[in-house]
Each structure stands twice: as structure tokens, then as C-alpha cells.
Regions:
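Residues immediately within or flanking Cys/His clusters that coordinate Zn2+
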Residues: 2, 16
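Short cysteine-rich clusters marking metal-coordination/redox-active sites
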Residues: 5-8, 19-22
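Cys/His-rich metal-chelating microdomains
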Residues: 11-15, 25-28
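Conserved P-loop NTPase
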Residues: 20-28, 32-45, 49, 144-146, ...
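The Walker A/P-loop phosphate-binding site
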Residues: 37-121
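P-loop NTPase motor core
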Residues: 78, 89, 131-220, 225-228
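Short beta-alpha junctions and helix-cap segments that line functional grooves
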Residues: 94, 117, 203-207, 230-234, ...
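Residues at the starts of beta-strands that form the adenosine-phosphate
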Residues: 101-102, 127, 191
Length: 269
């Protein structure tokens, strides 16, 4: 029976504990196992049992409406915007309102810098854990121990995985990092909230697959004519509409939401 290495993809006629070509340990899988049916079985649509888990609401009505009723457990959400738009501020406010065990992983700011921002927002919850880490494998290890309801990655361009030898922020690293974290979210049922940088062309920095690999894409943009106005909208939403947007103002105490969400393309007053 032939075996293929999951690391270098070379094929070998016999099993080895380590790949004879690349040296990876426990990486050889039989061809039959690699392309087998797996653990799950096809189920007819009428026979699917159970109901979807309830959405996790932020208690911010305009934001929950924007998502279609709140976060869907096990989903992946990408939040992108220009530097200084308030992405980290928004994330901390969401974690405070949800009030569930959460892990905020930063690969750019120190945890001390995040703590200073949290102090300014008067956030001091024992349910919010901060971690400076860029290795996806180690992050998943912390997930197994903490069992968070929400995982924040800030930012995905700073992360890397041992499965790729490319530099952090490169297309291979972003692809492997996003898919590894998304698989973990599906398996454990936590909400994955990924923060990404935005380019001048209004695209997520890195390969376009960053947007294709998640369930929801949120843009946080600065409003025209004023330095404190922000616009938040979904360019992609598998669980709701993309026609609405949130209007916000940046203040000393954080981002304030306008009571009503506007329609995409409407004038801001």
C-alpha cells in the first residue's frame, strides 16, 4: 500500500515513522486513508436533526442587526480597516458587551498597550484574556486549555504556522493560518474574529483569499469631512444581509453607535 507525506507530498511504497525525503515525523498517510470517506456520513436534508445554536448578541442593536442577529457560534468574521480607524477599540467594546470567556491574541501591540486601551474604555473583565503570540500552533494550544467563546486575532498578517516556511504576512502563511484557525473554530464552536489591515485600494492586505476564507467581512472606514466619524458595513455575510451599515463616532470613551443603522449608499448626517 503506498503512503504519501502530508508535509512534502512525496509518495513512498512503505510506511516510515519519518518521511525519508523531508524528515517530518508521523506525516505519512496511506493513500486510502488520505482520500477516505472520513468520520462524517452523508445525511438526507429532511433527516438532519437539531437546531442551529442561538446567536451571540453584543447588546449593541445596530451591530447585531448588521450581522443578522448577532454572531453565529463557530463562524469566522474578518474586520478590516485603515490604521487608526478603531478596530481594536471596537473589538474590546464587543468583548465587554458579550461578557463571555474570550482570548484576545495580539501579534503587533503588547498586552500592556492593549491594557492601556482597555483602561481608557473602562474595561476590566476577568473573562477577557490577553496573549502576545504569533505562532498559530501555540495559539490553538491555548484554545484547548481556555475554551474561549470568542477568539480575536490581531492581526492575521502577523501570524505564522509551522506548516509553511514562508515569511509571516506572505500569501502561503496567511492562507494556512486562516484555515487552521477556522478549522479550530468549526470544531470547538467558538467565534473567530480576525482583524486585518486594509490597503489603499480598500482590499485586505495579503491575498484576496483572506476575504473568501471567512463567513463575514466587515469594513470599518472613516467618514468624510470629520476625523471622528466612522462607517461600519458588511461586504460579505453568509448569515444575513449586506444592505445595512452602522454609523459611529469616535470619542474619548470609545466608539458610539448611532441608534439606527443606515442603508448602504445613504448620506451621513
Amino acid at each position: 500500500m503506498p503512503y504519501r507525506c502530508s508535509n512534502c507530498r512525496r509518495t513512498h511504497p512503505a510506511f516510515h515513522l519519518s518521511c525519508p525525503d523531508c524528515g517530518a515525523w508521523n506525516a505519512l498517510l496511506s493513500i486510502a486513508e488520505e482520500f477516505g470517506a472520513g468520520d462524517s456520513l452523508p445525511v438526507a436534508l429532511p433527516d438532519v436533526e437539531g437546531i442551529p445554536p442561538p446567536r451571540t448578541q453584543t447588546k449593541i442593536d445596530p451591530f447585531d442587526r448588521l450581522l443578522g442577529g448577532g454572531f453565529v457560534p463557530g463562524s469566522s468574521v474578518l474586520l478590516i480597516g485603515t490604521p487608526g480607524a478603531g478596530k481594536s477599540t471596537l473589538v474590546l467594546q464587543l468583548l465587554r458587551n458579550i461578557d463571555a470567556p474570550s482570548l484576545y491574541v495580539t501579534g503587533e501591540e503588547s498586552v500592556q498597550q492593549l491594557k492601556l486601551r482597555a483602561n481608557r474604555l473602562e474595561i476590566n473583565s476577568h473573562k477577557v484574556f490577553l496573549l502576545f503570540e504569533t505562532n498559530v500552533r501555540r495559539i490553538i494550544g491555548h484554545i484547548e486549555r481556555l475554551h474561549p467563546a470568542i477568539l480575536v486575532i490581531d492581526s492575521i498578517q502577523a501570524m505564522y504556522t509551522d506548516l509553511s516556511g514562508a515569511a509571516a504576512g506572505s500569501a502561503p502563511q496567511i492562507r494556512k493560518s486562516v484555515y487552521a484557525l477556522r478549522r479550530s473554530a468549526h470544531r470547538k464552536g467558538f467565534i473567530l474574529l480576525v482583524v486585518g489591515q486594509v490597503t489603499k485600494q480598500r482590499g485586505a492586505a495579503g491575498p484576496k483569499l483572506l476575504e473568501h476564507a471567512v463567513d463575514v467581512v466587515l469594513y470599518l472606514e472613516e467618514g468624510e469631512g470629520s476625523g471622528n466619524r466612522r462607517i461600519l458595513y458588511a461586504s460579505k455575510n453568509r448569515f444575513g444581509s449586506t444592505l445595512n451599515r452602522c454609523l459611529l463616532s469616535m470619542t474619548e470613551s470609545g466608539l458610539l453607535f448611532s441608534p439606527a443603522a443606515g442603508a448602504r449608499g445613504a448620506e451621513i448626517t
